[in-house]
């Protein structure tokens, strides 16, 4: 589910997530994890209201990246006839938790990796961890010819114009 709204003070936030957890009781188990705007503390509040809430333990980043990696492999198999990434080129837009986790999974195995982020600090962190990556502007990365384009930024990356420019 998605909850959209303005930032809440702590008391209103607890009430919001408690009410949300109560509302979803009828759907059965609800599997979630901390994500953008959703904290472990929010999940604890939800769990107190609804015992079917799961996802409080473990690092969701690792599992998100692994799920993306498996999806990429399946797509490669479908399109190229092999899930092997060793001869494949990648573009990763966004070097936050997920982008870095994807790099950990493909670095040293992929033929070429091009990355971009609007935060120069994140770019430098990625370059120090993965010295052979190529850095490109966030406004240009979707124009680079690659086998796999992985948008790991906050959103709005793929739209009518950017999709037309994918290579």
Residue spans for each PLM region:
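Short glycine/threonine-rich loop-to-helix capping motif typified by GTGT followed
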Residues: 5-14, 99-104, 163
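Glycine/serine-rich phosphate-binding loop and adjoining beta1-alpha1 elements at the start
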Residues: 2-83
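ADP-ribose/adenylate-binding Rossmann-like module
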Residues: 148-158, 164-167
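Flexible loop/turn segments at secondary-structure boundaries
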Residues: 39-40, 99, 122-123, 156-159
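General beta-strand structural signal in soluble alpha/beta enzymes
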Residues: 30-35, 54-56, 115-117, 137, ...
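Glycine-rich phosphate/diphosphate-binding loop of Rossmann-like nucleotide-binding domains
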Residues: 59-146
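Short amphipathic alpha-helical segments and helix-helix/interface helices
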Residues: 17-21, 103, 123, 161-164
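Alpha-helix boundary recognition
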Residues: 25, 47, 107, 142, ...
């Amino acid at each position: 589910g998605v909850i959209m709204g303005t930032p809440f003070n702590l008391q209103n936030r607890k009430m919001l997530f408690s009410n949300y957890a109560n509302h979803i009781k009828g759907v059965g188990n609800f599997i979630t994890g901390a994500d953008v705007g959703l904290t472990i503390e929010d999940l604890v509040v939800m769990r107190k209201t609804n015992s079917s809430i799961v996802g409080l333990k473990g690092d969701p980043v690792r599992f998100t990246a692994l799920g993306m990696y498996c999806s990429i492999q399946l797509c490669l198999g479908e399109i190229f006839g092999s899930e092997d990434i060793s001869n494949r080129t990648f573009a990763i837009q966004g070097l936050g938790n997920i982008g870095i986790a994807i790099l950990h999974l493909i670095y040293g195995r992929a033929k070429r990796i091009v990355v971009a982020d609007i935060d120069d600090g994140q770019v430098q962190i990625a370059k120090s961890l993965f010295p052979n990556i190529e850095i490109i502007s966030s406004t240009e990365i979707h124009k680079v010819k690659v086998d796999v384009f992985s948008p790991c930024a906050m959103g709005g990356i793929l739209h009518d114009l950017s999709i037309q420019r994918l290579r």
